[in-house]
């Protein structure tokens, strides 16, 4: 369950409290009463994937020779970002923002927490003319830009000429 969909901030609840409650609900969704993560089940994996995808907005641009995917990922280290191609035509951008653990170890106390931590993911079905062998990913200033080059257009088929023989 995602509390942000219920507009609870309108009832005077602080974002930090909502974030803590959301974390508790996420943990409860992903663990049994003894605190163990259950064996991977397709439904749970789908729900986690859907949450991660909903929390990762992206822009997609088409240029004459390429497609460009842009996602804001402030606070994420480049080493925590994965760019992959699945099933020959699905671009997957995924990773995890884990700063919360580091801060807690250093004795830092959050007064307000609005930036999302945890896993993120986006999947994009690539068009037929996308060249999956020519993908470039650049991460700079908290913005990931993935460029997928287009395949050259196929040459038009030339008509086949059949020689007519005299019988």
Curated annotation (Swiss-Prot):
All copies of domain sHSP, residue ranges: 49-167
Coiled coil residues, start to end: none
Disulfide bonds listed in the record: none
GO-annotated cellular components: cytoplasm
Induction: By heat shock.
Subcellular location: Cytoplasm
Family designation: Belongs to the small heat shock protein (HSP20) family.
Protein's recorded name: 18.8 kDa class II heat shock protein
């Amino acid at each position: 369950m995602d509390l942000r969909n219920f507009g609870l901030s309108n009832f005077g609840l602080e974002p930090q409290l909502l974030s803590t409650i959301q974390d508790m609900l996420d943990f409860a969704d992903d663990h049994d009463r003894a605190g163990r993560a259950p064996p991977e089940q397709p439904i749970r994996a789908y729900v986690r994937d859907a949450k991660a995808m909903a929390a990762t907005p992206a822009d997609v641009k088409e240029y004459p020779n390429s497609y460009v995917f842009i996602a804001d990922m402030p606070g994420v280290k480049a080493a925590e970002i994965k760019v992959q191609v699945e099933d020959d035509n699905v671009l997957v951008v995924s990773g995890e923002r884990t700063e919360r653990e580091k801060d807690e170890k250093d004795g830092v106390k959050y007064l307000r927490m609005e930036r999302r931590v945890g896993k993120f993911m986006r999947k994009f079905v690539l068009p037929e003319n996308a060249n999956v062998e020519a993908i470039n990913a650049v991460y700079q200033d908290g913005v990931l830009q993935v460029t997928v080059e287009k395949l050259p257009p196929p040459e038009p088929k030339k008509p086949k000429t059949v020689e007519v023989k005299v019988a």
